[in-house]
Amino acid sequence: MKKLFLNYFPFIIFFVSCQFNNYETVDKNIRFREKIQTGNFIKLSKGHTYYEIDNQKSLKTLVFIHGFSVPSYIWDDTYYSASEKGYKVLRLDLYGRGYSSNLDIDYTDNLLADQVIELLEELNIKQATLLGLSNGGRVISKIAYLKPELVEKLIYVSASSFQDHNPTENKSVSGKEINNFIKNNYPTISKGQLLDFKYPENFKGWDNKYENLLQYEGFARALISTRKNHVNLDTENSFINGSEIPFYTIWGDSDSAVVYNEFKDKLNKLMPRRKEYFVSESGHLPNMENKEEFENLLFNQILKEN
């Protein structure tokens, strides 16, 4: 029995080694970008940005900002519905996510906000309604603070913009941290995406799409750096509340990723002017899990308000 185990032991090591060697093997360089058959790429000041745009002659523009790790495809349902309704629609992959460049710099809120601002300027979009999902809520808060004239409305969906954060002193990301993150998280991180749903059984295959992201070199570093650079956005959110920008918060009624009750008192103090809505039978992604109710709220109420 011992001899049999020893015979299999090298195979086990080889299998595990191959499994981890499949992670972060793809460099998102020019050859990579040339193979992408959808959307567009544009070179901005910090790197290449992947984006999709439709109905460019429409006067009403919606810009969809994704969350912490899942890129712009997380907005598929709402993006295509808005496009069919005639809105000018724009979505992009933030740096470190999807098809956009993975950078070797700090992933701050300013970096991601500046990316969106630069893209809007390059596309000659003077004003837009910004929709920020989860961590994307942080990005739209920062945009509104830096360039309020760009913003027609702000729509926060399951936004992680309002919690308290303890500043991280050392914001650098070491190779050891990256390797440990890949080793400890990558084997299960895709399956973990299903926890965003109240009824994950209705979204079979959702985790498989995420698996593709794990092959891009620099993804783990982007996630670690983003988390390390999270700071309180009280100043930005207070500014928005005191501005004339209309803003709205939308929550899934069963969100276990961003737990509303943990920060609602702070939110009430920071942004009492907001209009707030809860989508039934949905977790962290109400735009997907209860598409009908979410889109009725978005298109027939929020976007029709003057």
Stretches with model-predicted labels:
Residues 142-145, 154-184:
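Flexible "cap/lid" loop of the alpha/beta hydrolase fold
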Residues 243, 249-251:
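Short beta-strand/loop motif that positions the catalytic acidic residue
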Residues 166-171, 181-241:
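Conserved alpha/beta-hydrolase catalytic His-Asp/Glu region
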Residues 254-258:
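Acidic catalytic loop of the alpha/beta-hydrolase fold
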Residues 273-306:
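Catalytic active-site module of serine/aspartate enzymes centered on a nucleophile-bearing elbow/loop
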Residues 54-99:
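Conserved HGGG/HGGXW glycine-rich cap/lid loop of the alpha/beta-hydrolase fold
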Residues 2-60, 84-87, 126, 300-306:
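Alpha/beta-hydrolase fold catalytic core
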Residues 45, 91-131:
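Active-site loop/oxyanion-hole signature of alpha/beta-hydrolase fold enzymes
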